[in-house]
Amino acid sequence: MHLNAHRILPAAAMLTAVLLGVGCGTETSARIDPALPSMNSREVGSFMAGNFSNAAQAKDNPAFEDIRVHLRPIWVDRIDGQWLYVEQSLATSEDKPYRQRIYQVVDGNDADSVDCRMYALPGDALQYAGEWKVERPMRKLTADLLLPISGCTITLRKNEDSSWSGSTQPNECVPPASSGVSSMTSLKIDHDGFEVWDRTLNAEGQQVGGSTAGPYLFKRTAN
């Protein structure tokens, strides 16, 4: 759920796959794991599905851009996780998303974790703009055409308050030709919304990009 885009301020730069917000990593062919999702991954997938806005935060603090995020379940008959189409845009130009991704929510490596894998869309992603509005989004696209964003999976664990939180692994989400920088995304999500903080770090672990004012706070506006 990454928030960065060349059209937004450096403070918002890096999303993104929350929700919200990851635009980095090596793209290869999609890996499909034929395993029935657990109740944990189903819960995280249900928390992610919906429309979200950080309008209140942006109004109170000009360091944050006013952003809209739409996540829609897709391919609901598949058994290899919860699949969602993700579209992010500035509030002033919702018809021109700056980030479009596919998320695959699956069980993690142990019974208490859930992984959110990131995929890029093939070809010109803008051809899919607005798919979140249709009854059966992405029905003309198949999972084998997706481009995995390796190293940028977010691993989540459940908290005592029933929210889920986690992050990408340090130094693993590395953009091509990065010259020693990596991306770090932290996410906390529940039924009411999510917090996401995308940062770009140099080889010494110092932040060189992304929000310096803390995480973006997105509230659910519709299911």
Which residue stretches match the model-derived regions?
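Bacterial N-terminal signal peptides that target proteins for export
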Residues: H2-A12
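C-terminal motif of bacterial Sec signal peptides marking the signal peptidase cleavage site
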Residues: G21-G23
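Secondary-structure boundary elements
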Residues: A58-P62, D77-D80
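Bacterial signal peptide processing site
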Residues: G25-E27
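Calycin-type beta-barrel ligand-binding domains and close structural analogs
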Residues: A30-D60, D66, A91-N223
